[in-house]
Amino acid sequence: MSGRGKGGKGLGKGGAKRHRKILRDNIQGITKPAIRRLARRGGVKRISGLIYEETRGVLKIFLENVIRDSVTYTEHAKRKTVTALDVVYALKRSGRTLYGFGA
């Protein structure tokens, strides 16, 4: 692993991350029209106004769980990059098998 930045695998202390943007309230980036399109794809004709916040909440919890499992797989493999396979395995673990991304 020579010539790969901060000392290769496990060496060095790792520097402070510069310009790390503070992430907050990004769930609002899932816009009302985006939720509406997803509902249309699922066959929904008419949507209550209260659905949007509820959908954002449910989506946030779902993504937190999948990402947590994906990162666990990544850390176990001693990698720093989450791969598509990590996500596939995390989804499979939660009972939602996804085809088309390997394994």
Swiss-Prot record:
Function: Core component of nucleosome. Nucleosomes wrap and compact DNA into chromatin, limiting DNA accessibility to the cellular machineries which require DNA as a template. Histones thereby play a central role in transcription regulation, DNA repair, DNA replication and chromosomal stability. DNA accessibility is regulated via a complex set of post-translational modifications of histones, also called histone code, and nucleosome remodeling.
Gene giving rise to this polypeptide: H4.1
Family: Belongs to the histone H4 family.
Keyword Acetylation: yes
Any one GO CC term of the record: nucleus
Gene Ontology molecular function, alphabetical: DNA binding; protein heterodimerization activity; structural constituent of chromatin
Protein name: Histone H4
Span list, region Disordered: 1-20
Post-translational events: Glutarylation at Lys-92 (H4K91glu) destabilizes nucleosomes by promoting dissociation of the H2A-H2B dimers from nucleosomes.
